[in-house]
């Protein structure tokens, strides 16, 4: 079982890391993307830390992470922010980050996979 990023690293470690990231890459947003706890059988993502441009949309982010998850074309990928909010694909990452950023400086996104053909 893969530990969640919040459990694997202390708050201080995460805060220190995002502070450095924001200093070095002011035009990027630090994001952690992990599978939802409810998706026991879903494949793990091969990379969970991302630095995305502020002008990226959720749809573009989905397009960029889909190859990093071993799913078939008949499976839909859904993202949840703050484990409760499903943003529209046209939502801007900067706005989502500003609204839902954790105190440690990361935006935490979880993904769920659903079969589109039953």
Go through the PLM ranges and name each one.
Residues 1-118:
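Ubiquitin system architectures
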